[in-house]
Amino acid sequence: MNHKPLTTAELAELTAGLHRLSRNLWWTWNQEPQEIFHDLSPRGWTNLYHNAVAILHEVSDYELRMRLQEPEFADRVRTVLKNFDAYLQSKDTWGAQNAPELLKNPVAYFSAEFGFHETLPIAAGGLGMLAGDHAKAASDLGLGFVGITLFYREGYFQQTVNADNWQTEYYAHLKPQNLPIEPVLNANGEPLVCTVKVATSTVSFRAWRANVGRCPVYLLDANLPENEPHQRDLTLRVYGGDTTTRVMQEILLGVGGVRLLRELGLQPSTFHMNEGHAAFLTLELAREKMAEGKAFAQAWAETKQQCLFTTHTPVEAGHDRFSSELMGFAANKFCANLKLSHQELMGLGRVNPADEREPFCMTVLALKGSRAANGVSELHGAVSREMWQCLYPGKKVDEVPIGHVTNGVHVAGWMKGTVRRFWRKKLATAHEQPDMSTTETTRFWKSKPLIDWEREINEPQFWARMADPAFISDEELWSLRYRLRRELIEFSRRRLLIQGQRLTQGDFITFDHMLNPDALTIGFARRFATYKRAPLIFQQFENIVKLAHDKQRPVQFIFAGKAHPRDDEGKRFIQHIIHLSKFSDLKGHLFFIENYDVHVARQMVSGCDVWLNNPRRPLEASGTSGMKCGSHGCLNMSIMDGWWREGYDGTNGFSIGDDTHPASIEEQDRRDSANTFKVLTEEVIPCFYNRDATGIPRQWLGKVRRAMTTLVPQFSTWRMVQEYTRKYYQPK
């Protein structure tokens, strides 16, 4: 069949559409645009680490025109652009129906880090990934939302391990022109520049805009020629530098963020602080009100009504504290602006304002400056009330005004392409061959066309179908699980080959035989903070070795994660695990994958059979990595802490221990290690290897079905953002 070539105007329209699409992070949680960018340059997709903007820079105009002249490819591009524009322009959203007032006066969400995708590595861990997922869900729901963070031009560190098995860090310079961000310009088409007073000088900053679907997230950037070198480095690295750098970063984030919003003409209804890093925004809001002639007491009371604070950790090191001397140097301008003495300013960040020895705590400032506060799980809310009761004299612990909203994950953003395509195909087949039953779930599906995939996979009714063998048989589910495990193993082999060749003369043959595609595969991947106890399971070393070497029921472990550059104890955990993987009887059964990031996480949560989580209770405020497993059929095996305490129901995974913990750290570690081994040997391994005559582990798949049904819709950021809206964003 002859197809009419595209005109110059048609080519220009599709080309412009692809460039526009590449600079909106919507493509990162939608499969079809990812496949288009991949097909434009399969090698570039790999070499440029899935960076759509960079791929369009790499592909020549001639190559792009030739691909667009292919009718099938051009049709795919048109369809994706049509869906993209329909998404952006839709007025029929949850936010429009349930919180229309926020479209005019949005929520301003401040976070020191945002994790969106591997192409924009400006997050250090779970706090940033939660912020990114929060923004994606707000976009999907059509909520009035704007994010504020910093643009770290070297991002978070890249990890390698040296010959001594010690973590080393290096930083890659991020080039804005190759990232899914765009400059914020003034009316003259020039970069919009704002200023903020830090210490004894003025810091200028510009902003970049990351389009997260419908929602903008602004990244403040101090790397301007008019700034001194140390000022430019305020936005060099995530959590980089010393405490002086940290307090200056936080002034820039909080004060600078408010000033940028005002320059943009935005009047947020709520300023949501994701951790205490941005708490200086409360002082800037009070300054604005005092500039209108109000006294500090009135200005502070009105500021509190605008602010919400989410605390994320009971770990002491997670709460920034600054000395009186440092505050006097870095934050002296606040005193003049607010007509406060230095001691009065310090009192805003102290539990006891009169205690001159007490440092200034950003969490205390955030709590004092907010109308409401919350923890990130039910247990964490209770722990936080006890932890901060000292700020509320006369109140019993259960009267402390700190609630909770349990975290979630953005299901579409974490769902691997293999699984997404599988469910799309299953749904299409189900609609072609409708079930004639009259159950509520069936009526739901017969009434909804397949036009909004993201909406469907966040509906409990979709996941309720996982319990129905008529919708998906055990054979199909087990085949999917095998494929995902196989993909993880192939990915791990490639990574291990690169790691091995850097340090030794390893060859592909050696690494191609690593990892058994039929073995029970247990994964552990997260920040190597010491309270997360990465090596805990290996306290039962001899017993674990026996399990790993069982030829009838083999077990293998894949670990990944980064320790903070200044956390030597976390680095020792990494060193210990790598040493075991190379020089102990666990060699060939234990593996460590370097440079943990979003891409590695997606491979692991999808391909592992079991997701191990053993924090020292109750220090895991929530945890979210285990939430990403459910949609892929990976089961959680976890201490009863954080989100798992709410998620586990006895049928949808495995519990290590119970809802208690001893006061002694040594006793807790000993008991948890023993319980981990007990659950592994008495529950996990027998359940996984108990096969019927056809080789299918029916009982195991029953747990997989229950996990999908009970966990995925409940622990999603769609549910989480809706809960924040009802509880905290909307005026009471």
Segments the model singles out, each with a brief description of its role:
Residues 1-732:
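Catalytic cores of carbohydrate-active enzymes across secretory and cytosolic contexts
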